[in-house]
Amino acid sequence: MSRIGNKVITMPAGVELTNNNNVITVKGPKGELTREFNKNIEIKVEGTEITVVRPNDSKEMKTIHGTTRANLNNMVVGVSEGFKKDLEMKGVGYRAQLQGTKLVLSVGKSHQDEVEAPEGITFTVANPTSISVEGINKEVVGQTAAYIRSLRSPEPYKGKGIRYVGEYVRLKEGKTGK
């Protein structure tokens, strides 16, 4: 039994869902998202409530059921509220700045790293050491934030690098002398 799949999704005011042969389009105040779901899963819309129903209890359907519901919920939340990932930089001389839609990072390399914003993603730099990635598609926001973090992930001795706000980086002890 999929506990997540059986939960009902409540659509907030201003969000509208259209189902065209399991190609779901969700429109809201922040934008529009379209995604194709498995043909065997049935998506029912009753007023402001969305339910996801699987045809049988086979192992394949059970695995798809919860995932479909979670993806659909992320679409509804994305077009109504949006998603945001915050990153922080630790290290001497580590800086971030915006040049148009491009994010330019100085992270201790001989060159600067430039990250082009994917479609639907906006970067915000509040101060030179903090970056915000915002958008309506949760997957793209997460992938973009993970890519930025991968350019200089935190090292385990001093913790220098790019990390998520609130991320705990376990520090190792250095070498001990004789």
Curated annotation (Swiss-Prot):
It comes from the Bacteria. GO terms for molecular function: rRNA binding; structural constituent of ribosome. InterPro entries: Ribosomal_uL6-like, Ribosomal_uL6-like_a/b-dom_sf, Ribosomal_uL6_a/b-dom, Ribosomal_uL6_bac-type, Ribosomal_uL6_CS. GO terms for cellular component: cytosolic large ribosomal subunit. Keywords: Ribonucleoprotein, Ribosomal protein, RNA-binding, rRNA-binding. It holds the Pfam family Ribosomal_L6. GO terms for biological process: cytoplasmic translation. The keyword Transcription regulation does not apply. The keyword Zinc-finger does not apply. Signal peptide: none annotated. Belongs to the universal ribosomal protein uL6 family. Part of the 50S ribosomal subunit. This protein binds to the 23S rRNA, and is important in its secondary structure. It is located near the subunit interface in the base of the L7/L12 stalk, and near the tRNA binding site of the peptidyltransferase center. This is Large ribosomal subunit protein uL6. It comes from Streptococcus pyogenes serotype M1. The gene is rplF.
